[in-house]
């Protein structure tokens, strides 16, 4: 069953005696509004100028192919901040988690995520990010601490 925030919560009990919930959370814009930028080029006065955009801005400009394109027309360059081999390396995800929390950029499923952690429930993270499990785990451990 999914709620309005995209949170999936399941109960695998045939009787109501022993109830175990497990959760699946989509990270970006659901748990935290992350500051991670997408590297784009914006056509201004006939010249393509580098311009970084947020994930929410990307949702708007991605379909404007006349005025916006991926940096160097290369997805690897444009989305390098969403991987561990980008310019900030393996700490990129953790750094962005710290920034989002310090700026109180909590997204709609944040409270459910915290409740899940407090209750020791099993959960999974759904994401299009290319981070390895270890850096993502560091981000979750930072939240737990």
Predicted regions and their residues:
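Alpha-helical substrate-recognition element adjacent to the catalytic core
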Residues: 2-145
């Amino acid at each position: 069953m999914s709620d309005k925030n995209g949170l999936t919560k399941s109960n695998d009990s045939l009787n109501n005696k022993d109830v175990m919930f497990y959760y699946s959370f989509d990270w970006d814009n659901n748990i935290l509004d992350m500051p991670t930028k997408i590297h784009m080029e914006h056509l201004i006065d006939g010249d393509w100028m580098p311009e970084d955009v947020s994930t929410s801005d990307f949702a708007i400009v991605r379909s404007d192919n006349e005025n916006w394109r991926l940096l160097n027309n290369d997805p690897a360059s444009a989305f390098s901040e969403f991987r561990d081999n980008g310019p900030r390396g393996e700490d990129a995800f953790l750094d962005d988690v710290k920034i989002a929390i310090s700026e109180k950029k909590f997204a709609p499923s944040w409270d459910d995520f915290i409740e899940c952690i407090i209750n020791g429930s099993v959960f999974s993270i759904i994401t299009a990010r290319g981070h390895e499990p270890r850096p993502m785990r560091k981000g979750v451990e930072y939240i737990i601490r």
